[in-house]
Amino acid sequence: MRWLDKFGESLSRSVAHKTSRRSVLRSVGKLMVGSAFVLPVLPVARAAGGGGSSSGADHISLNPDLANEDEVNSCDYWRHCAVDGFLCSCCGGTTTTCPPGSTPSPISWIGTCHNPHDGKDYLISYHDCCGKTACGRCQCNTQTRERPGYEFFLHNDVNWCMANENSTFHCTTSVLVGLAKN
C-alpha cells in the first residue's frame, strides 16, 4: 500500500505544479454547464420518461369520487390547499384528470395538504391542463406553504403549460402522491 500512497502523492504534486486553481475551477465549471444540457437537472417528472407512479394511496377515505361534488368543487377541499387556477372538476374533468381536449403538463408543482378526516398530511402533485382557453369556473388562489419564486417547483404562480406544445392554460388537477414524510 505504500506504493499507492507514493503514487497518489506524486500525481497530486505533479498536477499542482502544472495547473492553477483558476484553470481547475474553469474546467469544473465547463463540465457542470455542459452536463446540464445532457442530464436532467430539474426535479420534475417528464411525460416521455413515464415519471408518474401510482402509490395506491387513493384508498376509500381519500377517493375524491366518494366526496360530494360541492366539496370537491370548493377551494376549501383539503386537496386544493396549494392550487392557483381553475379546478378541472368544474371544467369537465375530475380532481385527477384533465377535461377532454386538454392535455396535462409534463411538469408540475407540489404541495403538502392536511386531510382533516384522518389528521394526516399528504403530498399532492398539481398538474395544469393545457391546450384550451382558460376555463373561468371555480377560480382558486390558495397559497398554503407556497415558497418564493426561486424555489419554483414549490411555487404555484408559474405557467406550467410552458412545457407543452400548446401553452394555453385551462385548469388544474390535484393528484394525490402519497403520505408526506417528516
From Swiss-Prot:
Site feature: Transition state stabilizer: 172
Output this protein's name: Aralkylamine dehydrogenase light chain
User: Residue positions of the PTM Tryptophylquinone?
Assistant: 109
Q: Where is this cross-link: Tryptophan tryptophylquinone (Trp-Trp)?
A: 109-160
Q: Name one GO molecular function term.
A: aralkylamine dehydrogenase (azurin) activity
Q: Where in the cell is it found?
A: Periplasm
Q: Which PROSITE patterns match?
A: TAT
What InterPro entries would the database entry show?
A: Amine_DH_Ltc, MADH/AADH_L_sf, MADH/AADH_Ltc_C_dom, TAT_signal
Domain of life where this protein originates: Bacteria
Annotated substrate binding sites:
84, 156-158
Q: What does this protein do?
A: Oxidizes primary aromatic amines and, more slowly, some long-chain aliphatic amines, but not methylamine or ethylamine. Uses azurin as an electron acceptor to transfer electrons from the reduced tryptophylquinone cofactor.
The activity regulation comment is: Irreversibly inhibited by phenylhydrazine, hydroxylamine, semicarbazide, hydrazine and aminoguanidine. Reversibly inhibited by isonicotinic acid hydrazide (isoniazid) and isonicotinic acid 2-isopropyl hydrazide (iproniazid).
Assembly and interactions? Heterotetramer of two light and two heavy chains. Binds two azurin molecules per heterotetramer.
> What lineage, starting at the top, does this entry show?
Bacteria, Pseudomonadati, Pseudomonadota, Betaproteobacteria, Burkholderiales
User: Keyword set for this entry?
Assistant: Disulfide bond, Electron transport, Oxidoreductase, Periplasm, Signal, Transport, TTQ
The answer to whether UniProt assigns keyword Signal to this entry is yes
Question: What are its GO cellular component terms?
Answer: periplasmic space
Cofactor binding, per record: Uses a protein-derived tryptophan tryptophylquinone (TTQ) cofactor.
Question: Where would one find the signal peptide in this protein?
Answer: 1-47
